């Protein structure tokens, strides 16, 4: 019996297994049965382990009828725009859900949220349920109790899919009509592989294959997949050619530049800079060490404005430089967009769509970016501004050329605006998202 059951039950995160053992519910020799109990008896165990018998909601002010499809959206945290890291895109998805004939709920799974209803509703739609008290322990109990309630579950980010993979398979067996939508955005393993190559510590061929196999396995439970770009869609399609894959990118509203060429003088970098090993921190440090000194020799009047949360310890030396200004989190970026002559995106490894690049382009700021980002954006007209990160001298000269050449600056400014107006409109994102739900008979 044990053998047959174990074949049917997918793995449960080790953290939950340990909690069961620590509570004395099971002995260590019964660890395999912990997996079974977590799924079969999730209601009991979830409440016992978390002490969370009731889930507090911020309930929707108004809902559609009971016959409307019920869709649960799971991401790491409440998707405030200032967080970056894909959260602005999640906020747009919430906005779209709020406009459809569905009853939507949202769970910020990874980070506790103590924001008041008024705070939540000032940033997000008020006709969505926000289940703020759920966490990585109580989610299993909740999903078990609601196993016959939801018609679709949207899961964002690979680590969330990995964490919930086992219980999602169980829910699919219990309710075959349930639709699982995996908002993968991109294959993150390729970023990790590129990161190690960039740092001069490449993974072995076997390690690369293992990472790819592990991540692509997460897609197997999905009835539909979201990618953020056509290039990411092609990568995923290589592994799952028969699963519907929709490009759900982002929407950005374009703005004609407030200031012209001669009223601008700064370089601008925007991004979250809290983690030392993040692509943003790596790229900024590389730029400031390898590129910025050469730019300053040719443009001594230039300053570098850095906007975004910046708590990474590796940034401390940069904060002492007079020519580099850290401005922290800013709710409004208009002032910085208006002052910037050149936007820099020196990313050396990444996956997905760089929303900060789209934001700068939407304000008519020419961008100097690495080939990594240029490829992700599929931005052929901007090819002259895509520089391999190892070519530091070329990156420097491209920055200086845009800074000094008014005609070239105007040309690149207009090309960026045209690209945003054709590739990142609200209508395109709305239609792509709605079509994806229609394909699953959810609308």
For the regions a protein language model found, what residue spans apply to each?
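Conserved acidic donor-binding segment of nucleotide-sugar-dependent glycosyltransferases
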Residues: 385-393, 401-406
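Membrane-proximal helix-turn-helix segments that form the acceptor-binding/catalytic region
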Residues: 188, 203-225
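Short hydrophobic beta-strand element within catalytic cores of glycosyltransferases
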Residues: 356-360, 366-371
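Acidic donor-binding loop of glycosyltransferase active sites
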Residues: 149-152, 223, 323, 338-352, ...
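Conserved catalytic-core segment of nucleotide-activated headgroup transferases in glycan assembly
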Residues: 86-95, 106, 220, 224, ...
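Short N-terminal targeting/anchoring amphipathic segment
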Residues: 144-163, 179-181
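Non-catalytic membrane-proximal stalk/linker segments that position and tether the catalytic domains
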Residues: 3-80, 86, 120-123, 443
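A charged, aromatic-enriched C-terminal amphipathic alpha-helix characteristic of glycosyltransferases
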Residues: 404-438
